[in-house]
């Protein structure tokens, strides 16, 4: 009985880990990739047109 319970828990953890569901929060897709990066004047000019 105990072996079956441990086997079910291990299989659940393995499946969730395979699909990428874990304790770490997912990164915010809307976050700036480099928040401390300096603004490049050329990139600003290209954005402004």
UniProtKB/Swiss-Prot annotation:
Q: Which residues form the propeptide?
A: 24-37
| Positions where Leucine amide occurs in the chain | 48
Q: Where are the AXPX repeats?
A: 23-26, 31-34
Query: Chief location of this protein?
Result: secreted
Q: Where in the cell is it found?
A: Secreted
- Could you confirm whether the keyword Transferase appears in this record? no
Span of the signal peptide: 1-23
Can you say what this protein is called? Venom peptide 3
| Species whose genome carries this gene | Eumenes pomiformis (Potter wasp)
């Amino acid at each position: 009985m105990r072996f079956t319970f441990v086997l079910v828990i291990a299989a659940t953890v393995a499946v969730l880990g395979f699909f990428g569901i874990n304790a770490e929060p997912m990164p915010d897709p809307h976050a700036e990739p480099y928040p401390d990066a300096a603004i490049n004047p050329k990139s600003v000019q290209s954005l402004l047109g």
